[in-house]
Amino acid sequence: MHRREVHVVIGAGVAGCLSAITRSRAGYQVVVLERESARSAGTYPVCTQTSNIVSENHSGAEYPFDPRSARDCLDGRIENERFFPELIYGGKTYSRIIASRSMMDDGHDIVGQCRANMRVIQSHYADRRAQDPADAVFGDPADICREIPTVPGVHDVAAAFLTPQRGMNPVLVSTVLDWELRSAGVDFREGSTVTSVTHRADGRYEVAYRGADGTPETVVADQVSLCAATAAFGMAKRLNPSIVFPKLFLALREILYVDLPDGTDKNFTCLKLEDSYGGMLSPLNNACAMIYHPPAAHIMNLVMDPETCAFPDEYVHYLAEGHPEKEKRAEWTLDRLREFYPELRRSTILGTYLKVAINTVSDSRVRRNMGVFDVRPGCTMSVLPKWTMCAVNARKEVTLALEHSVASGRLSADEARELAGHAMRPCLETLPAWAGDPQSITARAAAHAVNMNVPQVLAQRFAPPHAESASSRGTV
């Protein structure tokens, strides 16, 4: 690189963290501006918003009504398998996708839908494997999906399906990202509220922000990455008024953490389909779980203003002050899921969280990747409709950054190709000492739980699962 470029990444959710890590690995000088401040000493405040209640690395199996959603999620799952370490799963194994008996009894062939979707997943994985042998991360295509008649300890099951889908622990994800940010030498500026991003006549960008002490600051960047979730759309629109986004639906949802006083025999997520017939039980360890029941969780769904791309005032209020139905909906969720999952019989609610899910359709059963937006030369925007797509989008984003450097004469095309591969090398490729010490892992994860405002019990893990053979996932 003829001159080391300065890149500013706005936002430190999972998209922003991956943008910063991959850009820094590619040789750029990276500054992260994150609004939140750490509450635990020696940590960065990463994944403190929506990412604090994401616990599933989707394979597409939960979207049996939309093959494109299934393929998008599987693409993400493959990339994540190559990028993230085993540590993020906290001892969890493959999720169970459960077709509800009551849904079948009411005339909805959810089992048939799931079987058809398994074929979509197998076919797409076979195509990916044929295109690039490095994508064969789950073995033979015939072995990645399996139907089983039931899931012990779950009620109202018509059939269940094992796929590469796998639950992960959000505080362990933050622990890994924090380490990688530091290892990459990222300049992380917490407590920084961005006030404006302007494009300069020389092609660079001026980013104005208020520092942690309230002092106005500016940084001039060669390139900018907009990763501040829903706020990124408005930033992009101001930088490029002619940019066109798809129609965007913003769904306000409620997710719960609960305790498990009786423990659980499930070191895997149960995703019971569909809508009023089901819900998610995602144990993070033997002591707590994340739960979700769609009718109770889905509070509102608004369309983003296509002209201003402003975040709805109602959501600003609810996220800051809470929703008036928050407690009622939480009890509704717990009461309903007790009918399916006996380990919730004596559970109590540890925390109730509101999040905004972004989608390009109003139907939550469809979740397609929006990709990375090329806002203008040297400025990208990455917003995730699904956590699973984070590494796919990070690869695309760092590729666009390198292409801009080539176009600007700062890199050769050969250099860019080499740096792109280096940028996407696996996390924890060289295992640090703390990652081999269970107590150190727990301590680091607990510190991030404080930052993320989630129960510290999340820092506990299941015992490591036994290695699963291909036959344990294979088609019956």
Predicted regions and their residues:
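N-terminal Rossmann-like FAD-binding beta1-loop-alpha1 element of flavoenzymes
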Residues: 5-31
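Glycine-rich FAD pyrophosphate-binding loop
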Residues: 25-50
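Central helical "cap/lid" subdomain
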Residues: 40, 211-274, 284-287, 404-408
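Dinucleotide-binding Rossmann-like beta1-alpha1 core, especially the glycine-rich loop
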Residues: 52-147
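Helix-loop-beta segment of a Rossmann-like dinucleotide-binding subdomain
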Residues: 88-101, 141-185, 206, 376-383
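Helical element adjacent to the flavin cofactor pocket in flavoenzyme catalytic cores
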Residues: 157-223, 227-234, 390-400
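C-terminal catalytic lobe of FAD-dependent flavoproteins
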Residues: 158, 329-429
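Active-site lid/adjacent beta-loop-alpha segment flanking the redox-cofactor pocket in flavoenzymes
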Residues: 268-366
